[in-house]
Design a protein with these regions (language model features):
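N-terminal ligand-binding lobe of clamshell/alpha-beta domains
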Residues: 1-283
């Protein structure tokens, strides 16, 4: 029996990614040739949808199709994919499930994946660029605040019925972008059901200046939010500060959230800061 030991020293060669963030990261590392299957929800990068077989949703997977691809590693995310992982493990497949919930944990995941495919040095370089950009953003916000700008209160709605508030990495990125999460205590809860706001009146009471909607892939409808009973006097509604952040840009705990997602929140927040500062100067 011939065994190519050297090939195993270069990390997994046939990877299935059950969520988008590992797919995007492997493409950014120039390691897309290792990917043999992806999630059907993958939109980043766009060419992945054209090049790679789709083998899973988020909560379900085509196990037979995955096995037919003969993967030597499957990347998954969170307890929500535990059943998929368990079934693949019982079939003899190597499965690595990440469970990142914070910005620092996302960076840790990125480094681990890079190291697994022999790209630790390149991974660290790309991570350093992202960290530098986030630090620069936070410092720019600090300068604005020192010059009289006010940080807006922000409600990030991850789902509409029931209301679900921001997961931890979104809340942290919101803070870097210049906003203050209206529900910081809920951001620490890892599970969506623990971040349900049963009484929408509590959102009204906290009176957010900005509302971001990212309804897990469902189109955000600002007009529906504005029409909610009792919401007419919420600052964000009165001032038409209701904006969509596309789910692939912010709810995938990987490169997208750390770059495009946080930048989009930052742009809306800075525009609000400038308008708020002008209105207070006139008053």
């Amino acid at each position: 029996m011939n065994i190519n030991i050297a090939s195993h020293l270069q990390g997994p060669q046939r990877i299935v990614c059950l969520t988008e963030e590992t797919t995007e990261w492997l493409y950014l590392l120039g390691q897309e040739s290792r990917i043999v299957g992806i999630s059907g929800y993958t939109v980043r990068p766009a060419k992945a949808r054209q090049e790679k077989p789709k083998v899973s949703a988020f909560l379900s997977a085509k196990i037979d199709k995955i096995l037919a691809l003969k993967p030597d590693c499957v990347f998954g995310f969170s307890d929500l994919q535990a059943d998929i992982a368990a079934e693949l493990i019982r079939k003899g497949v190597q499965v690595t499930v990440f469970n990142q919930r914070s910005v620092s944990e996302i960076f840790s995941m990125l480094y681990q994946v890079a190291a697994m495919v022999g790209q630790a040095a390149q991974g660290l370089e790309k991570i350093a660029v992202m960290q530098t950009d986030l630090q620069a953003m936070a410092e720019a916000v600090s300068v604005r605040v020192a010059n009289g700008a006010r940080r807006p209160k922000v409600f990030f709605e991850e789902w509409d019925v029931p209301h679900i508030s921001a997961i931890r990495w979104v809340s942290e990125l919101m803070g870097i972008a210049g906003g203050d999460d209206c529900f910081p205590e809920l951001a620490l809860e890892p599970m969506g059901k623990q971040r349900i706001i049963a009484d929408g009146a509590e959102i009204v009471r906290r009176d957010p200046d900005i509302i971001f909607g990212s309804w897990c892939g469902k189109k955000f409808r600002p007009e529906n939010v504005a029409a909610r009973l009792g919401w007419a006097d919420v600052a964000a509604v009165k001032n038409q500060q209701l904006f969509e952040i596309k789910s692939p840009d912010i709810l995938q705990p990987g490169p997208a959230a750390l770059t495009d997602g946080v930048k989009k929140m930052h742009a809306f927040i800075i525009a609000w800061m400038d308008a708020d500062q002008r209105s207070r100067a006139i008053a």
